[in-house]
């Protein structure tokens, strides 16, 4: 029996106030309006950004809110004017939209669509939500809210993927994998035969290593204080792994010595502001490129010795790996389907949506790299 045009009652993981655990709630999901798509979720990945945001007091005005921003699903129905997807299509959710019309989208050098401005409202459109919980307007984290059985999302924030795509694994491509892999491929432009150092070995850091390997790097040194992550790092392509706590001298000096005046490319993936200067100092003094991949809070000020730039180092940022999302994320899914890379080492746990708090705790404790939730 078709549900198109009808309100769908289903379950979602809802945050009622920052710092509280998520609760499974019944929600009502209204039909999509113009340029909107209603998606039956198949899988959702938990990203470190989700976990950081759970305790962020700035999220309070947007509660109740459905968390999650990585996901895949099947189109249940579409609103008027939708042309890029249709009912029954397999899709991936895009936490960074691509409208295809703004100056940024039309510029080949940029990927941060101007419609990303809605992300801070946590609404799918200007001032509106298609979801309610206990009669209250319910927000969707970064306009997505993938920890739900159904969501309504703007057409520019969803992309069709191949019919044979394995949605239960491909869900992490929408943010975590794309962010790390693209930081190496697009943002740093790692070159064949180069040397790389990656600081932080979570899911995104491991994806950076995979990107460095795919680009042909000759030497990839993984850096983390948790040695339990080293085996996985080597599985995805690290040639060496080091723990800064094992050395008496600063880790940047260790890497400088190991790589003949520093690495060609370094990546900061911990989200720790102090590590940014360390990563910058670890890259080659003349031509080294350091990419900030880890998410830093907007109020954090970086304190970096200006002399590090004197001889030619470059420090740059990277958002979602530099991908034009609606165009290029589906291509990554196709590459995964074609076995050009393997996501299995990244997905260490798969749980049902009602176990979301257990999954979050596993990630907080460092026992899990990436967890996939199945509604």
From Swiss-Prot:
CDD domains named in the record: alcohol_DH_class_I_II_IV
Annotated tissue distribution: Liver.
GO biological process: retinoic acid metabolic process; retinol metabolic process
Keywords from the named record: Cytoplasm, Metal-binding, NAD, Oxidoreductase, Zinc
Catalytic EC class: oxidoreductase
Main location: cytoplasm
Localization terms from the record: Cytoplasm
Listed GO CC annotations: cytosol
UniProt: Zn(2+) 2 binding residues: 99, 102, 105, 113
Gene3D superfamilies per record: Medium-chain alcohol dehydrogenases, catalytic domain (3.90.180.10), NAD(P)-binding Rossmann-like Domain (3.40.50.720)
Binding site for Zn(2+) 1: 47, 69, 175
Keyword Lipoprotein: no
Highest taxon listed in the record's lineage: Eukaryota
Catalytic activity: a primary alcohol + NAD(+) = an aldehyde + NADH + H(+); a secondary alcohol + NAD(+) = a ketone + NADH + H(+)
Similarity-based family: Belongs to the zinc-containing alcohol dehydrogenase family. Class-V subfamily.
Subunit relationships: Dimer.
Protein name: Alcohol dehydrogenase 6
Source species of the chain: Peromyscus maniculatus (North American deer mouse)
Gene this chain is encoded by: ADH6
């Amino acid at each position: 029996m078709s549900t198109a045009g009808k309100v769908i009652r289903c379950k979602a993981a809802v945050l009622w106030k920052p710092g509280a655990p998520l609760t499974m709630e019944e929600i009502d999901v209204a039909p999509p309006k113009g340029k909107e798509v209603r998606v039956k979720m198949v899988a959702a990945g938990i990203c470190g950004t989700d976990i950081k945001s759970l305790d962020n007091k700035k999220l309070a005005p947007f509660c109740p809110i459905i968390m999650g921003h990585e996901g895949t699903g099947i189109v249940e129905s579409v609103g008027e004017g939708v042309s890029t997807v249709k009912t029954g299509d397999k899709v991936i959710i895009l936490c960074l939209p691509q409208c295809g019309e703004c100056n940024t989208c039309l510029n080949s050098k940029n990927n941060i669509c101007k419609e990303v401005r809605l992300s801070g409202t946590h609404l799918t459109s200007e001032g509106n939500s298609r979801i309610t919980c206990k009669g209250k307007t319910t927000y969707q984290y970064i306009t997505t809210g993938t920890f739900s059985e159904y969501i309504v999302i703007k057409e520019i924030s969803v992309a069709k993927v191949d019919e044979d795509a394995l949605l239960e694994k491909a869900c992490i491509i929408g943010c975590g994998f794309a962010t790390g892999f693209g930081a190496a491929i697009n943002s740093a432009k790692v070159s064949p035969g180069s040397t790389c150092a990656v600081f932080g070995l979570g899911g995104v850091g491991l994806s950076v290593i995979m990107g460095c390997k795919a680009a042909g790097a000759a030497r990839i040194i993984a850096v983390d204080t948790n040695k339990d992550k080293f085996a996985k790092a080597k599985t995805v392509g690290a040639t060496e792994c080091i723990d800064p706590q094992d050395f008496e001298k600063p880790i940047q000096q260790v890497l400088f010595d190991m790589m003949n005046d520093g690495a060609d490319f370094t990546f900061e993936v911990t989200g720790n502001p102090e590590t940014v200067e360390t990563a910058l100092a670890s890259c080659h003094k003349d031509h080294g490129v350091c990419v900030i991949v880890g998410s830093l809070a907007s109020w954090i000020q970086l304190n970096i010795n200006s002399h590090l730039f004197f001889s030619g180092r470059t420090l740059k940022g990277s958002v979602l790996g530099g991908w034009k999302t609606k165009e290029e994320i589906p291509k990554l899914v196709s590459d995964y389907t074609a076995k050009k890379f393997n996501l299995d080492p990244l997905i260490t746990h798969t749980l049902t949506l009602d176990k979301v708090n257990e999954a979050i705790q596993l990630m907080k404790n460092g026992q899990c790299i990436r967890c996939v939730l199945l509604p």
